[in-house]
Amino acid sequence: MAEVAVGQASDLVPSEMDHEVIYSHLQGPLEGTIEPATPTEVVSNGAPLQPAPAELANSQGGAHVQPAPAEVVSSQDGLPTLQPLPPASIDLTEEVQPSEENMEVVNPGTSEEPSQGSGANPTAGAARSVSMNNFISGLQRLHNMLELLRPPPADHSVGPIRTRRRMAPILRARAGESQRQDNGRYVPHTPLYAYFQVSRSQPYPLPAAHDSETRNPPSGTDSDSDGSAEDEEVVVQAEEPEANIPEQGVIATDQEATSVTGDDAVPKESPQKPNMLSAMEDEEGETCTICLEQWTNAGDHRISALRCGHLFGFRCISKWLKGQTRKCPQCNKKAKHSDIVVIYARSLRALDTSEQERMKSDLLNEQMLRKQAELESAQCRLQLQVLIDKCTKLNSRVQDLEKFVVRHQNSAAQQCSRSKALCGKCLSSSQSPGKYSSEKTFTISQTGKCRILAYCDGLSCLVASQPSPQASFLPGFGVKMLSTANMKSSQYIPMHNKQIRGLSFSSQSKGLLLSASLDCTIKLTSLETNTVVQTYNTGRPVWSCCWCLDENNYVYAGLASGSILIYDLRNTNTYIQELVPQKARCPLVSLSYLPKAAVAAFPYGGVLAGTLENASFWELKSDFSHKPHVLSLEPGGFVDFQTESSTRHCLVTYRPDKSHNTVRTVLLEMSYKLDDAGEPVCSCLPVQTFLGGPTCKLLTKSAIFQSPENNGNVLVCTGDEASQSTLLWNAGSGLLLQNLKAGEPVLDICPFETNQNSYLATLTEKTVHMYKWE
C-alpha cells in the first residue's frame, strides 16, 4: 500500500454528497453481500485501517482478481469465505505520486444503478467494489496524515475503559441476511464513521507497535451460523470531558479498539476503581450481613445488635433467631430473640482508633517506666545519704583513734614492760607447777572388768562401771557410787546385762546418768532414786555415748558399726536420726561433744566421733541436722578421742605401729576455712605430741583439762601400760610434769573439783586411785 504525502491530502477529501451516497450504499441490503470474516481492529494511535477488499469468485463463472490484500471465495454451498488479510505498513517518509491505480474517484450515483437491476454484470459489480475499497483506503491514509499533525495529549494518566456488550441477536440477524441463493457481490456493511471512532487525545505510536497491536482473530462465520451468544469487548481511551464518543448502532462482527502509547500497553484498570473500592467499603458498614442489603433507621429493617455486638437488620436477625440455629451469624455465640437491641442512629460508621489506643498504651508504658525510674532514683539518693553518713562516722572514728594513739604513745613502753613481766611470771609458773598427791584408793571389784569413770557435780559423787558383786544372785553390770565429800564408797546400782562401755552425766538434769552397753541398749538412770528411768534398744552393740551440750534433750550413741544414733528424751520409742559414716565402718570407740562458743578460731559445735581407723566431726546445724567433716589425721590405730571446750582443742591417742614404736598422744587445734559456697570446712592442726610406752593392748582413755592453778595452762593426762602409771604433761611446753604410779594399767582418767579442791581419779580393772592437787 502506497504512502500519500501531506501536500496531496486535500485532493483526497470527498464532498458531503459523496459521503451520504457512500453511507446509503453501504447500509442498504444487497444480494450476495458477504460478512467480513475477520474483525476490524481500530487503533487510535494512527495505525493503518485495513478495509478488507476481496477477490470475488463465483461457482459458475471465473474469478475476477482485484489488487486487494484479502480474498473472498464463494464455495459450492453458497457461503463466502474471507481469507485473513496480511498486515500492511505505511512508510510516511517515502513520496508516492498519486495515480489512477491507487486513487480513483467513484461516482456513487452511477455505481448504484446497475446493482438494482436483476441482470447486473458481475464484472461491473466487482469494479465498483474495487473503486469503493480504493476510496476507503484513501480516506484511511488521509486519517493517518491528520493524526501526524495532532498534538500529543496533556494527560496520560487515564487508562482505557473496557466495556462488554452482548451482540448475539445482531450477529444472528446479519447471518440470515448474508445467506442468499443467488450470486452476490461483496459490499462492506461497516459504516464509514466506524473507522473514525478514535480518541483525539492519543499520541502517534512508534512503528514497532503496529505488529504487536494488530491481530486477526479467527473467522466468526461458524459462530454466526450456530447462533451462539458472543461477548463484544471494546476498549476505548478515556477522553477529555469535552470529547463526545458516538454510539455504534450496529456492528457486524466483534470489534476491539485498543489504545497503545509507545511500546507499552496502557493498563486496562478503570480510573474510577479507587472510588469504587471506597464506595464498597462504605457500603460494607451500612449493609446487613444476612441479606446483604442496607439497613434503615426506621421500619422493620432498622439497625439492631446482639449481646456480642454484631449489627444486623431487625427483620433478618429476628427471622434468623426464630429458626433452629439460635446463634450469632458471625461469631456463633448463643443468642435469643430477647437479646436483640434496636439501635436508634441515622448512620453507623466504625471509627478506627487503633492508633489512638496504641498511643495510649505507649503513654501508660512511659508513665510506668518514669515512675519506676523515679523510685530507683529515690532509692539511690537514700543509699547515697546512708553512705555519706557512714563515711562521716568512719572519718570521725579515725580522728578519735588518731588522738588515742597520740595520747597513749608515751605509755606504750610501759605496757611492753608489763607484758614481758607477765610472760616471765607465766614461764616461772610453768617451770614449777603444782603436783598431785595420792589421797585414797578404793577397791571396786575383786574380779576386775572395770572400764569407765564418770563424775556427777550435782551429787558430788564418782561412779565406776563394774560387774555385779553378786553375779550368782544378780548377774549383769552396773555402777559403784563413790562419795567425794567423805571419800567413802557407796552402794552398787545394777543397769545392763553386758559390759558397760560408756558413762556420761547430764549437765542440766541432776543425777541423770547415760550409760551404753554391749547388750545393744542405752539407759537413763537416776542416781537420786537409783532406778533406770528410760531404756532405748539400739539393735546393735553400743561402744560409746555422750550428751548434746547445746540441746540437753538429745543424746548420741556410738554403735559397733560406726553409725551414730540420735535420741530425743521426749520420744521414748526410737531414735530420731542416724549419722552414717562416710568411710570404713568400724566401732566408735569414743564420742565427745564440743559445744558452740563465740570463739573466732572455731565457733562451731558438734560431736567428735572417733573409730579405730578414722575420725569425723559432725557439725550441728540450726535445724538440728548434722554436716560431716572428715578430719585429716595421721594414719594409724586410734585408741581414744577427747575434747577441751574452752580452748577448742582435742586429744588423740595412737597405738604403736611400724613408723612409731611408742604410744603417741597428739594435741590438735580445731580450725576451719570457708569453701567457694561460703560453708565452713573443719580441720585440725597438730600442736603437741606426747610419747608413752611401747605397748598398748587395752583401749585406754586419756584426759585434757585446765590446770588447777587457773593460770591458763592446759594439762594432758595419759595412761602408760608399760610403766603401769599415769603421765601428766604440760600441753603448752610438752614437758612431763608427773608420773603417778598405779600398779596396774590405767584404763580411764577423770579430773573433778569438789569442796574447792582439785582431784584426779584413775581407774584400773579393780581399783580407783584418788589424787589431790597441792
Swiss-Prot record:
Say if the entry is tagged with keyword Coiled coil: yes
Q: What happens when the gene is disrupted?
A: Mice are viable and do not show overt phenotypic abnormalities, although there is some evidence for increased embryonic lethality, earlier death, and subfertility, associated with testicular and ovarian atrophy in mutant. Mutant mice embryonic fibroblasts are hypersensitive to DNA cross-linking agents and show increased chromosomal breakage compared to controls.
Q: What Gene Ontology molecular function terms does this protein carry?
A: MDM2/MDM4 family protein binding; p53 binding; ubiquitin protein ligase activity; zinc ion binding
**Record-listed E.C. numbers:** 2.3.2.27
For this protein, the record's SMART domains field holds:
RING, WD40
Q: In which pathway does it act?
A: Protein modification; protein ubiquitination
Top-level EC class? transferase
Q: Which reaction does it catalyse?
A: S-ubiquitinyl-[E2 ubiquitin-conjugating enzyme]-L-cysteine + [acceptor protein]-L-lysine = [E2 ubiquitin-conjugating enzyme]-L-cysteine + N(6)-ubiquitinyl-[acceptor protein]-L-lysine
Its GO CC terms are: cytoplasm; nucleus; PML body; site of DNA damage; site of double-strand break
What is this protein identified as?
Answer: E3 ubiquitin-protein ligase RFWD3
Report the source organism: Mus musculus
Gene field: Rfwd3
